[in-house]
């Protein structure tokens, strides 16, 4: 009888310990309640700016503050770049650079005949042709409109690279063998023209 009482006493003790308000699982819940009191972290966390050591209560506020430092650094770079003449050239090419001088002298590892056209501004009287094929013959852009609008266009003749003046370009546009590819954005509507981008070798 005493043995059964001691077993009951042990079970009741361990049972209470498991359901005690200070058990391990309840301590975690209590700790979580302490960390997030009324939806806010407690104690409040602070985020420190690495440049000026100013502290912020949220990561979003720190991010907005870092944008100010980015603008300041950009201004500093712009002010320093004209004063220093021996700075290395940037890795990005200048979009306003004229490539016509580079196109006239081929690189050492390529053959003299290059398939790339000379990139000239629209006012330039000369054009170099490459191998480009087929715009739809249903084009609403007539040769007269192409000459009137001062759009930059590549004039292509089958396989032969030639140079034209702007007067010759209008004459050649009337020829069925020449295809004009307008380089202006938004000039070709998908519903009006269909561009064939298939690569072909030799003459078609």
From Swiss-Prot:
It is found in: Nucleus. GO terms for biological process: cell differentiation; flower development; formation of plant organ boundary; hormone-mediated signaling pathway; regulation of cell population proliferation; regulation of cell size; specification of floral organ identity. Residues 153-204 are annotated as: Leucine-zipper-like. This is Transcriptional regulator SUPERMAN. Expressed early in the third whorl, and later becomes localized at the boundary between the stamen and carpel whorls. Also detected in developing ovule primordia. Induction: Repressed by KRYPTONITE/SUVH4, member of the histone H3-K9 methyltransferase family that contributes with other factors to the CpNpG methylation of the SUP gene resulting in its silencing. The alternative epigenetic states of the SUPERMAN locus have been called Clark Kent alleles. Positively regulated at an early stage of development by LEAFY and by B class homeotic proteins APETALA3 and PISTILLATA. Later expression is maintained by both the B class homeotic proteins and the C class homeotic protein AGAMOUS. These two steps of regulation require the intervention of additional factors. A zinc finger (C2H2-type) spans 47-69. PROSITE patterns: ZINC_FINGER_C2H2_1, ZINC_FINGER_C2H2_2. SMART domains: ZnF_C2H2. Mutations in SUP cause the ectopic expression of APETALA3 leading to the development of extra stamens at the expense of the central carpels of the flower. The keyword Nucleus applies. It comes from the Eukaryota. Probable transcriptional regulator considered as cadastral protein that acts indirectly to prevent the B class homeotic proteins APETALA3 and perhaps PISTILLATA from acting in the gynoecial whorl. Principal function is to balance cell proliferation in the third and fourth whorls of developing flowers thereby maintaining the boundary between stamens and carpels. May fulfill this role by repressing genes implicated in cell division. Plays equally a role in the determinacy of the floral meristem. Is also required for normal ovule development. Keywords: Developmental protein, Differentiation, DNA-binding, Flowering, Metal-binding, Nucleus, Repressor, Transcription, Transcription regulation, Zinc, Zinc-finger. A motif (EAR-like (transcriptional repression)) lies at residues 195-199. GO terms for cellular component: nucleus. Contains two overlapping leucine-zipper-like motifs at the C-terminal region, which might serve as a site for protein-protein interaction. In this domain, a slightly degenerated ERF-associated amphiphilic repression (EAR) motif seems to be involved in the activity of transcriptional repression. Pfam families: zf-C2H2_6 (PF13912). Residues 78-115 are annotated as: Disordered. One of its GO terms (molecular function) is DNA binding.
